[in-house]
């Protein structure tokens, strides 16, 4: 849980090894690993990572490349579909003791109704105790569970249930932000009444009339202002955010799923965000989009929902829909930083950086429609490399946007991850925010609202990075993205103010915890296990990049340094560092049982070789 007061930060005690002068020779851009762990090779065979994939690359509709070039970077044509049961059991029979009745009858039902033959057709149970039963005291997937023998009595043909554990789980272990089916159906049928955002949209529409009709525009604006209904909550009355020195995990597409975020909460994170949701599918009631605001109860308070939009009307409606249909949301975050071409061409994400008036209308619409949920924004330094625009943009957001917090990723859209984040520029923007906050304290009208938080983002991979930036004047906290994927215990290091040389068994335990959370979330049946395995492989596509600090020749480690081929201090450490996705599948089998022959997983990243010059 986040507390309003954070402890005073002292200068971290940096390990002596990071202060030692490095007299050894190493190749620039290549991680410095102790010689005894290097594998002799004539060239450096490494993996080229396209880390923009975590910022929206899995969204449907990604445009296909026009010309066929040598394939490298991310795999756009990955087959991500997971297989379901060959024989599909009728949902009414999942729990033999349940009184549910098949609505169409056994004769007409397209699902299987013979429990005995269904059980015979199932693959052999996975060894061990069902993670869901162990956590909740019962298993919602019933006899479809792949660990069925751990909670099924074949003599009585009944499921085993632990009443005490079930009662405890009701208050400590459950998921939140489930939208009501009827409300979602109304959105799908376009019958949902957006009572809060409708007058807001009408008012904002009046602000974008053609300037050629200025006189007419003024009259219309007067009419709209007369009919405009004030938002039920002013900025000062919205929920409070506590981001000063908070340990923040960045919004991440695909890998920033609920099990991962839940894992990060156990490893010290204060604030987590949903994967990016698109505003139009949200207000149309699309099931996949409404799965994104779901969270584990442990994430709240401190859970934010991130949305992307190119239209103020869509953003306002999405903000209202989230406010009225969720219960555990601490903030709404507008994505103005996603560099992916699909969103950019649609005017979403980083496209808004060059359209400040549109961005401000979207923020205004969200703020007026989001009830007591504060609105925040995440931006980049600009669109093009060398042409930073964040200072001017942030100045306007402070004056007109009513954002509760601003996060700046220290790269332009054009740069992507090709260069290191510009923390000098982040600090420059932080000074702008700090000065504005100080002016607000002197302003009578500004005294009623809380200061705007400013958060920096980019290349944070150690406690040294974190403290260096948090102790920079004007920067309230730091948001961590790739660093928290490759090294999930990064916030434990921040708390301890030292490097933690996690053993291979400790790292495996972290992966095991993710696997349990994944099964709890996606289910313990064949389909749920397949999904859990797929997302665990996605997670491993980042964790395998970790180089143990105990084998490094110099510290601190850098995210953009490529690792040469190396071996670990034991076989498990070597396995956890494998770049072969087949080894990732082997690791999942330690927790999820043997993968089926038809399990499909294609890594996002393709291998590339570099000459060691």
Curated annotation (Swiss-Prot):
Enzyme Commission number(s) from the entry: 1.3.1.89, 1.3.1.-
Root EC class: oxidoreductase
Lineage: Eukaryota, Fungi, Dikarya, Ascomycota, Saccharomycotina
One Pfam family in the UniProt entry: Dus
Record's protein name: tRNA-dihydrouridine(47) synthase [NAD(P)(+)]
Provenance organism: Candida albicans (strain SC5314 / ATCC MYA-2876)
Recorded family membership: Belongs to the Dus family. Dus3 subfamily.
Zinc finger extent (C3H1-type): 90-113, 130-151
Keywords, alphabetical: Cytoplasm, Flavoprotein, FMN, Metal-binding, mRNA processing, NAD, NADP, Nucleus, Oxidoreductase, Repeat, tRNA processing, Zinc, Zinc-finger
Biased amino acid composition, Basic and acidic residues: 1-20, 56-65
CDD domains in the cross-refs: DUS_like_FMN
GO molecular function list: flavin adenine dinucleotide binding; mRNA dihydrouridine synthase activity; tRNA dihydrouridine synthase activity; tRNA-dihydrouridine47 synthase activity; zinc ion binding
Residues annotated as catalytic: 338
GO biological process terms on file: mRNA processing
Basic residues: compositionally biased ranges: 66-80
Required co-factors: FMN
Top-level taxon: Eukaryota
Region Disordered, residue ranges: 1-29, 48-80
Cellular component terms per the entry's GO annotation: cytoplasm; nuclear periphery
InterPro entries for this protein: Aldolase_TIM, DUS-like_FMN-bd, tRNA_hU_synthase_CS
